[in-house]
Amino acid sequence: MGSAQEEISVDVLVIGAGPTGLGAAKRLHQINGPSWLIVDSNETPGGLASTDVTPEGFLYDVGGHVIFSHYKYFDDCIDEALPNEDDWYTHQRISYVRYKGLWVPYPYQNNISMLPKEDQAAAVDGMIDAALAARVANTKPADFDEHIMRTMGEGIANQFMRPYNFKVWAVPPKKMQCAWLGERVATPDVKKVVNNIIHNKTAGGWGPNATFRFPAKDGTGGIWIAVAKTLPDSKKRFGEHGTVTKVDANAKRVTFKDGTVVNYNKLVNTMAVDALVEHMGDKELIDLSKDLYYSSTHVIGVGIRGERPERIGDKCWLYFPEDNCPFYRATIFSNYSPYNQPQKGVKLATQQLGDGSKPSSSELKDGPYWSIMLEVSESSMKPVDQKNLLKDSIQGLINTEMIKPGDEIVSTYHRRFDHGYPTPSLEREGVLTKLLPALQDRDIWSRGRFGSWRYEVGNQDHSFMLGVEAVDSIVNGAVELTLNYPDFVNGRRNTERRLQDGAQLFANKKAGMQVDTEL
């Protein structure tokens, strides 16, 4: 839309075309009331839910994304974008923790029965101590580490929870708060755990993503490209001419890299809020945002020639708390869709063997192929040797028996994402309870995984609905449940909003619909 150096005016400007920005735009398009525009510095929509393709044809998401949903409106929107049965694969989550050479079913704390006897004893000891202490505790845990100790005890804390969470967050659990936990961490039932140990049984199926969907083609990014296509081209500015250089909150003007200026009445911002306040040049808010912490994410992909090994089987994602590999999670990405890697007839050269040695031949050969996607966190408290990370990760795959030294690696991928995880730090709420209202007082709704910085509502469905609900707040003053009451939305099926019913409702009521008079 539009050429350089122009001036545009809209009622609502949406910055960012990841899930949150697209949620806002989708709702604005559905309401068909206020004028609006969505902008993004990337040519391709999707944000942190995008997908890259290697030169050899292997797909890798920006980390481990799967579709499970708490909202019918979200389901409606992605089903509209990808409406056919063959657009999707549905999977049972098959997930394990690697511990002392064993594959322990996830969640670890519910499957102590799989551990060596001495670890079982330490885990049960700790759980009993924790259960007894919890009975007399009259204060809430001060931090995530204290929560772990109170709910699981020292055995599980030392075996899994402390080392694993440090690998994920790149911050010790002592420095994290625990209000974010909700459905994110399974609390063990001591009686059930002991019962499973005696009967040598495992427990599984816990959590919101015990089953999930994955797109057949184009990875997770394909979902958001398809959602963006349901929006009119005239209201999208993606790429260089969608790159924000300045936000003047007082004048309600946003300047873009090509010189274009957009005047707005209300702004839905989904870029990282620390970047937003820098673009605003507001020293007070910049200083406030400095107490928001985040970790960076390295995504590493390894494409391998050969049939998927039996030891890998139909595993989905795997957790690695130990220090024999740099990654905290591995996803068998080729299990999600047969189109996440080149087809069998595609001829590729072997780039290296698993042990790093050169192949005996550079001849192009057929598949089949399978792939692994790895995630490594980085922060000032957990630095990463970036130069050797790919090599160290492949060695980690050998150390954990995921691949063999002689396996033929035909493709590798490594990309660093500066803003990977918004850390639920001890300081977080103190910042957000001042920063987000201060922005809203200036008619800026900052929302999204990093726009509002709340990890507990940072999945794709949550992120999308943060945008939808921001628009409803702007247009009719509706309460934003996802932002303000995460436990409430996570504990129910949210069916109040629907795409089709809503569209008819808006069409019927449009003549009499009241839109915020400032719009």
Model regions: which residues?
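C-terminal segments that line or cap access tunnels to active or ligand-binding sites in enzymes
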Residues: 264-266, 270-445, 452-456, 461-466, ...
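Core beta-strand elements of the Rossmann-like FAD/NAD(P) dinucleotide-binding domain
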Residues: 8-10, 257-266
